[in-house]
A protein has these predicted regions:
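Electrostatic cytochrome c docking/interface patches
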Residues: 14-42
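Stable alpha-helical elements in mature extracytoplasmic
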Residues: 33, 82, 86, 111-115
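Generic hydrophobic-segment detector
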Residues: 3, 26-27, 50
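C-terminal capping alpha-helices of c-type cytochrome domains
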Residues: 1-16, 95-123
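Periplasmic/extracellular electron-transfer cofactor-ligation site
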Residues: 30-32, 38-65, 72-80, 88-100, ...
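A broad, low-specificity signal for short, low-complexity segments enriched in glycine/proline
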Residues: 8-11, 24-29, 63-65
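Short strand-loop junctions, especially beta-strand C-caps/beta-turns
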Residues: 69-72, 105
């Protein structure tokens, strides 16, 4: 039992380290803050249209699920997946894809950086 507990504790530490590293990378890549991004994601009501595993208020089905954004090739159906493009899409989706169902919600550039940091951590 002690060996199993020690192995479990070791795996927990490994997973925690991996998550911390993912958060650091997302913040460095986007210039945003993951925790503020999760709060902004909720505040702007993004979860009303989009699902994100592990985020209780994000269970929408109108828009695509937002897990795995970091590994997608394209953002908004048109742009290369780069932080600046994701942020542009979040701030003004109509400028990227006129007629898209995603509305312009008044997201500030600072909030878009934070939301993009949050999304890049969702696997």
């Amino acid at each position: 039992v002690a060996i199993t507990a020690a192995a479990g504790a070791g795996r927990y530490a490994e997973v925690t380290h991996e998550k911390e590293e993912l958060v650091r990378k997302a913040a460095a890549m986007t210039g945003g803050d993951v925790q503020r991004g999760e709060a902004a994601f909720s505040r702007y009501g993004c979860g009303g249209c989009h699902a994100v595993k592990g985020v209780p208020q994000a269970s929408g089905t109108v828009g695509p699920p937002l897990d795995g954004v970091a590994v997608r090739a394209i953002i908004g159906g048109r742009l290369e997946n780069k932080p600046a493009n994701l942020q542009r899409w979040i701030v003004d989706p109509q400028s990227v894809s006129p007629g898209t169902a995603m509305p312009r919600l008044g997201v500030t550039p600072a909030d878009a950086r934070d939301i993009s940091a949050f999304l890049y951590t969702r696997t």
